[in-house]
Structures are given as C-alpha cells and as structure tokens.
From Swiss-Prot:
Gene Ontology terms, MF aspect: microtubule binding
Protein name: Cilia- and flagella-associated protein 144
Keywords (A to Z) from UniProt: Cell projection, Cilium, Cytoplasm, Cytoskeleton, Flagellum
Region of interest: Disordered: 79-99
Secretion signal, residue range per the UniProt entry: none
UniProt gene name: CFAP144
Polar residues bias: start-end ranges: 84-99
Family: Belongs to the CFAP144 family.
One CC-aspect GO term: motile cilium
Annotated organism of origin: Gallus gallus (Chicken)
Subcellular location as annotated: Cytoplasm, Cytoskeleton, Cilium axoneme; Cytoplasm, Cytoskeleton, Flagellum axoneme
Tissues in which the protein is found: Expressed in choroid plexus (at protein level). Expressed by motile ciliated cells in choroid plexus.
Pfam family, one: FAM183
Role noted for this protein: Microtubule inner protein (MIP) part of the dynein-decorated doublet microtubules (DMTs) in cilia axoneme, which is required for motile cilia beating.
Family matches, as InterPro entries: CFAP144 (IPR029214)
C-alpha cells in the first residue's frame, strides 16, 4: 500500500481479476431468480374499467340526437343562447355591432399602424438590421 500522498501503483491483471471475481460473487449472492408468479390472495383485486374517452369502445353505441343538441346548446356563447343579457357583466359588450361606420379615409378617427425607423428597430428586437 502506498503512503499517504504518495503515488499509487496501478493494479495488475491478477488483482483486477480478483476484484471482478469478488464483485460477481456478491452480485450472484444477492440476486434471486423468480420464475413462478402468482396473485397475492391477501391483497384486494381491483377491476380495471375501460377508458371513457376511447373511441374504439363506443363505436357501436348510437348517438342520441337530443342529448347532442343539449350539449351543443350549452357550449354556445351567451349572445346566441339568450335574447337579452342575464347578468350585469353580460351587459358590457352585449351589442357588438359598432354604432358608427368606420371611415378609413378619415384620419381623425382611424389610426393605422405606421412603419417608421423606431418601430422597425423595436420589431427587430432592439437590434438594427444591417443593410
């Protein structure tokens, strides 16, 4: 054995073989091969049900038209379901049609996006493009 802080001798082939033999012997001692399997009678068995959303299990079932109509009706937005708003929150934005027609030639009320040097600089992520 080398002294503390000294150089360690590299292991020779006999020493490496002895280490490998010892390792394999310990592994084989701890491993156990099971070839027969059975159900534990003391543990309760749970039944596995089918997946509810699987399409291949529900192919033969006919679709109920009334039920589908109820589902589709419930998924509609409130303006299509009801003639008037049902809550105070629904009153805001119930009428979605604009009160006046938008005149795109009138510059007082129409502000389109413009491309300037500053907007192109910020759209590029703050880095000016080299041209």
């Amino acid at each position: 054995m080398a002294a503390r802080g000294g150089k360690k001798e590299p292991p020779d082939a006999v020493h490496l073989n002895r280490l490998l033999y010892e390792r394999v012997r310990k592994e084989l001692r701890c491993q156990r091969l099971h070839t027969e399997h059975s159900i534990n009678p003391l543990r309760p068995v749970h039944a596995v049900t089918q997946k509810p959303m699987s399409w291949h299990d529900n192919i033969e079932e006919p679709a109920d038209a009334r039920f589908l109509n109820i589902i589709h009706q419930a998924a509609l937005e409130p303006t299509k379901k009801y003639s008037e708003p049902q809550t105070e929150s629904q009153e805001i934005g119930w009428n979605t049609t604009p009160l006046t027609d938008v005149d795109r030639t009138d510059r007082r009320l129409f502000f389109p996006r413009r491309r300037t040097e500053i907007t192109m600089h910020s759209a590029a992520g703050g880095h000016p493009k080299k041209q």
